[in-house]
C-alpha cells in the first residue's frame, strides 16, 4: 500500500510460481506458474502423479478474497503473459501451441480463449498499443519465412504487412515442400510431425531419410533459422521427418507429463514406431538409408535410440547426454532440469532411471555409425558426456567419431567453427546415407598412428 507503506502477504510460500502482474483495476493478480502452483489446482495431467513443471499455466487471484482460479487448466497450449489490456479488459498470451507459437486472447467475463488469426505460424514478438485496443504490432515467421513484421487490427481481425526484410534473399532460394504428417501410436495417441521434401523432389526416385527430434520437454518449433532446420537437410537431397514425441509442452498437460521420470523410454519407442510407419507410407524413402539427428536432450535421444534399434544407417548427436547421473551432478543445469524431468528421483532412490536409461550403460548394444559433437566448454551438458561414450564405443570396436568444437559452449556461435561443424554433420550423413565419403575424407583424412 503506497499510502500506508504496509505490505500484505498474498502468497506465503509457493516454489511453483513464476511471474505476477496486477489487473488494470488493481483488484486481481494474474500469476503464471507450474500446474503444481497453489496446491495443484491447475493440474490436469490424467493418471500421471507428477505434472511437468515446464508446462506453464495461468491463474487469477482475487485480492479481496484471496481465491485463485486456474484459467488454463483445460487449455492445451503453454502460456506466457503478453499483456492484460486496460482498454478491452482481455488478457493476451504468447503460447507454445504444438509446433507453433500463437497469440491467444482470454476474455475474463466469459472464461473463453480466442486465437488471433495472425499471418505467421510462429509469433516471436507481439505488442498492443497502450491506449488503443484496436492496434497491435507483431513479428513472426514459419517454415518459409522469418522476421516478417505486421500491424494488426483486433476489431477487423486483419493484418497489414509492414516489413519483410528477408524476402529478397528467400526469393532466391528454392525451398522444399513441407506438410504435416501424423501417426497414431500403439496407445492411441496422435503423434504430430512434419515432412520436408527436397526442392527438386522426384516421386519416382528413392531418397535417404533423416529423422530429426528434440524429444525433451519442448517441441521442435517451425522455422528456417535453426541450425537443424529441415530445409537445410532437404537441400542436400534428403527427405526429412520431424517428429514431436510424447513429453513436449504445448499439447496438453497429460502429454507433457509423460516426460517426467521417463528419460527416453516412451519417446524412443514412438520415434522408432513413427519412422517405420513414415517409411511404409512414403515409397520414395529408402528404408535402408535412414539417419537420425538431435542435440542436447535430442543428442541424448540419438545415443539412447541406438541402444534400442539398428534401423538407422547413421546417427549424429550434438551435446548429447550419455549418463543421466553424471549430467545430473556435473553441469550447471543438470540438477535443476532433473528436478522437473526426474522429479523426486535421485541416483540413490531410483538408480535404474539414472543408469539404465543412459547409452553409456548400454554401449554394447550400439552398432550404428555414430558421430558425437561437443563444445569443449559446454556448461549445460559437459563434454564428458560425449567423451565417455566415445571411449566405451572405441573399446567395443564400434563405428564412432568424435568432433570437439574448441571454446564453444552448448551452442556453436563462432561463425567459422559453426560452418565446419555444420559441414561435418552433412559430410557424415553423405558418407553413410549417400555413398559419398569424399567430403568426410577431405575434412578428416584418415590417420595412421
What is each PLM-predicted segment?
Residues 19, 94, 101, 113-202, ...:
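Non-catalytic accessory segments flanking enzyme active sites
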Residues 11-18, 31-59, 70-79, 93-104, ...:
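A flexible loop/linker signature enriched in serine peptidases of the S9 family
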Residues 2-5, 62-66, 107-111, 153-157:
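Short loop/turn segments that connect beta-strands within beta-propeller blades
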Residues 226, 235, 242-449:
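Active-site-proximal cap/loop segments of hydrolase catalytic domains
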Residues 22, 84-86, 128:
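Residue-level recognition of a conserved intra-blade site in WD40 beta-propeller repeats
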Residues 26-29, 90-91, 133-136:
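Hydrophobic beta-strand positions that form the internal "hydrophobic ladder"
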Residues 197, 204-215:
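Short beta-strand element of the alpha/beta-hydrolase
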Amino acid at each position: 500500500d503506497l499510502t500506508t507503506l504496509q505490505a500484505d502477504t498474498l502468497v506465503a510460500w509457493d516454489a511453483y510460481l513464476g511471474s505476477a502482474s496486477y489487473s488494470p483495476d488493481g483488484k486481481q493478480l494474474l500469476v503464471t506458474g507450474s500446474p503444481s502452483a497453489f496446491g495443484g489446482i491447475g493440474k490436469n495431467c490424467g493418471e500421471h502423479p507428477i505434472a511437468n513443471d515446464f508446462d506453464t499455466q495461468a491463474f487469477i487471484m482475487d485480492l479481496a478474497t484471496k481465491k485463485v482460479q486456474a484459467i488454463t487448466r483445460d487449455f492445451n497450449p503453454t502460456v506466457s503473459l503478453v499483456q492484460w489490456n486496460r482498454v478491452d479488459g482481455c488478457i493476451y498470451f504468447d503460447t507454445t501451441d504444438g509446433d507453433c507459437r500463437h497469440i491467444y486472447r482470454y476474455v475474463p467475463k466469459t472464461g473463453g480463449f480466442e486465437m488471433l488469426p495472425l499471418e505467421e505460424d510462429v509469433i516471436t514478438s507481439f505488442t498492443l498499443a497502450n491506449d488503443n485496443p484496436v492496434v497491435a504490432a507483431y513479428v513472426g515467421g514459419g517454415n518459409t519465412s522469418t522476421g516478417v513484421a505486421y500491424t494488426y487490427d483486433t476489431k477487423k481481425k486483419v493484418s497489414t504487412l509492414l516489413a519483410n526484410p528477408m524476402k529478397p534473399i528467400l526469393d532466391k532460394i528454392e525451398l522444399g515442400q513441407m506438410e504435416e504428417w501424423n501417426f497414431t501410436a500403439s496407445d492411441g495417441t496422435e503423434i504430430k510431425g512434419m515432412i520436408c521434401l527436397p526442392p527438386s523432389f522426384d516421386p519416382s526416385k528413392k531418397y535417404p531419410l533423416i529423422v530429426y527430434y528434440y524429444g525433451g520437454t519442448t517441441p521442435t518449433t517451425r522455422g528456417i533459422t535453426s541450425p537443424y532446420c529441415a530445409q537445410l537437410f532437404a537441400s542436400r537431397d534428403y527427405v526429412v521427418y520431424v517428429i514431436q514425441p510424447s513429453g513436449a509442452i504445448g499439447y496438453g498437460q497429460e502429454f507433457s507429463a509423460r516426460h517426467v521420470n521417463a528419460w527416453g523410454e516412451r519417446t524412443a519407442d514412438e520415434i522408432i514406431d513413427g519412422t517405420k510407419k513414415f517409411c511404409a507410407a512414403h515409397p520414395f524413402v529408402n528404408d535402408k538409408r535412414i539417419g537420425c539427428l538431435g542435440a542436447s536432450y535430442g543428442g541424448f535421444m540419438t545415443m539412447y535410440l541406438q541402444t534400442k534399434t539398428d534401423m538407422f544407417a547413421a546417427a549424429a548427436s550434438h551435446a548429447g547426454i550419455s549418463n543421466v547421473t553424471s549430467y545430473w551432478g556435473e553441469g550447471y543445469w543438470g540438477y535443476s532440469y532433473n528436478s522437473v524431468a526426474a522429479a523426486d528421483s535421485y541416483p540413490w532412490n531410483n538408480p535404474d532411471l539414472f543408469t539404465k536409461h543412459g547409452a553409456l550403460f548400454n554401449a554394447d548394444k550400439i552398432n550404428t555409425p555414430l558421430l558425437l559433437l561437443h563444445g569443449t566448454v559446454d556448461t549445460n551438458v559437459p563434454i564428458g558426456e560425449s567423451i565417455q561414450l566415445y571411449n566405451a564405443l572405441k573399446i567395443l570396436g564400434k563405428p564412432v567419431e568424435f568432433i570437439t568444437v574448441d571454446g564453444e559452449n552448448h551452442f556453436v556461435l563462432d561463425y567459422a567453427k559453426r560452418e565446419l561443424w555444420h559441414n561435418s554433420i552433412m559430410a557424415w550423413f553423405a558418407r553413410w546415407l549417400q555413398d559419398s565419403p569424399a567430403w568426410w575424407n577431405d575434412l578428416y583424412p584418415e590417420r595412421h598412428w
